[in-house]
Amino acid sequence: MLRFTDEHEWLRLDGDVATVGITAHAAEQLGDLVFVELPKVGAKLTKGEAAAVVESVKAASDVYAPLSGEVTEVNEAAVADPASVGTDPQGDGWLYRLKLDDASAMDGLMDEAAYAAFAK
């Protein structure tokens, strides 16, 4: 299940763990990424709080926790090669994995069609 937030993050659910990243729209707006800071594994995140930072030559932007949960994994490759987040944001450029407190909360997020309309 793929869902999107109004802060331009995407989540892909596998069981009760969501892979989180920024959308292609956000990556395009930011331009060439030069720095990525991710949360620590084991960190408890609350929906809406700043969880990560992506920085481009144009701007730095917080990436917000789309839902509440615990960070189970981070994409070290994205830290080592921030450009990968911009070139493949919904693939190899994922940021972190979050064990959701309540997986049913995904239902409150946008599907792909709703996000496409929102991001226009």
Curated annotation (Swiss-Prot):
This is Glycine cleavage system H protein. One of its GO terms (cellular component) is glycine cleavage complex. Gene3D superfamilies: 2.40.50.100. Its cofactor is (R)-lipoate. The glycine cleavage system is composed of four proteins: P, T, L and H. Signal peptide: none annotated. Belongs to the GcvH family. The keyword Metal-binding does not apply.
